[in-house]
């Protein structure tokens, strides 16, 4: 579901020109008392942000219309603490609302990746993480057999 809808978001502006944001897309930026959301959909007619209590909740607890910027990004700011909530974007194209998607730049997702998760990245490191040191071995001496 999310992959198909996300692919539909990557497109051209209505005049055929490709509009690309200048900086890497920060889709969900948690700041405690507010969270900023953005999705790149330059040819969408409208976009909505939907917030859910859980990854599988049927009805959003908040739906917000998003505003289109000149860079093709639709943006919305939630002015409350929504840490732990899940989100989707829904865009309208050719008069039809497409399926909801977690977006193409979600850094954290819920069950099956269908919804993005609002995370405070400052709380994700385990105790002692900053002091952790990797093995002292030359990179040329490392052999990686399988990596996913």
Regions found by a protein language model. Name each.
Residues 8-11:
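C-terminal motif of bacterial Sec signal peptides marking the signal peptidase cleavage site
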Residues 40-47, 82:
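Short proline/glycine-enriched turn/loop motifs at strand-loop junctions of beta-rich domains
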Residues 14-36, 68-146:
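The feature marks proteins involved in alpha-glucan
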Residues 60-69:
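Solvent-exposed serine/threonine-rich low-complexity stretches and specific carbohydrate-binding patches
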Residues 1-2:
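N-terminal export leaders
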Residues 5-6, 39:
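Hydrophobic helical h-region of N-terminal Sec-dependent signal peptides
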